[in-house]
């Protein structure tokens, strides 16, 4: 189970702003869906066909996204908690809006219950961030601790990968010169790209 809530003071958020941004985002998704449906038509239709025949889809998506975000933030502000129940309440109301096109009450409740249960379970289990992650730990500090914990010594990396190809440990040039001298009998003189350093 994901950690639900914490001991910090709840900071209320602007529900209207969240609702408007959710409506714009989901309205764009509805416009994309209506555009895709229009582009799949076999007969040639005009550009306004997206709005005349896909207007219901665009409006449904816009209302569902706006109501979901508004209800989620409003319930969080009223309950003064940030948990999965807020997402479930918002998804229930947003899903009910998606069922309004059928004009049948059981369908409206079914869409709302399905959306609320799926989104609520998703949020309750931690969503995309995972159920085991502590919300009180800073993400940067967590990644730095993981890097320090899992960092391998340079000698081990060099033993597996080898030298060259951008990996130049101390003493690489001398070892390279020695290998070329032993293998091919060619002596390579050290050259520096720095004009201030005199070559030997």
From Swiss-Prot:
Q: Which GO terms describe its molecular function?
A: NADH dehydrogenase (ubiquinone) activity
**Entry's localization field:** Mitochondrion inner membrane
Q: Which InterPro entries match?
A: NDUFA11 (IPR039205)
Membrane topology for this entry? Answer: Multi-pass membrane protein
EC number in record: 7.1.1.2
- What cellular component terms from Gene Ontology apply here? mitochondrial inner membrane; respiratory chain complex I
Listed under catalytic activity are: a ubiquinone + NADH + 5 H(+)(in) = a ubiquinol + NAD(+) + 4 H(+)(out)
What is the purpose of this protein? Transfer of electrons from NADH to the respiratory chain. The immediate electron acceptor for the enzyme is believed to be ubiquinone.
**What PANTHER family does the database record attribute to this sequence?**
NADH DEHYDROGENASE [UBIQUINONE] 1 ALPHA SUBCOMPLEX SUBUNIT 11, NADH-UBIQUINONE OXIDOREDUCTASE SUBUNIT
Name the chain's protein: NADH-ubiquinone oxidoreductase 21.3 kDa subunit
Which organism is this entry from? Neurospora crassa (strain ATCC 24698 / 74-OR23-1A / CBS 708.71 / DSM 1257 / FGSC 987)
Q: What is the lineage of its organism?
A: Eukaryota, Fungi, Dikarya, Ascomycota, Pezizomycotina
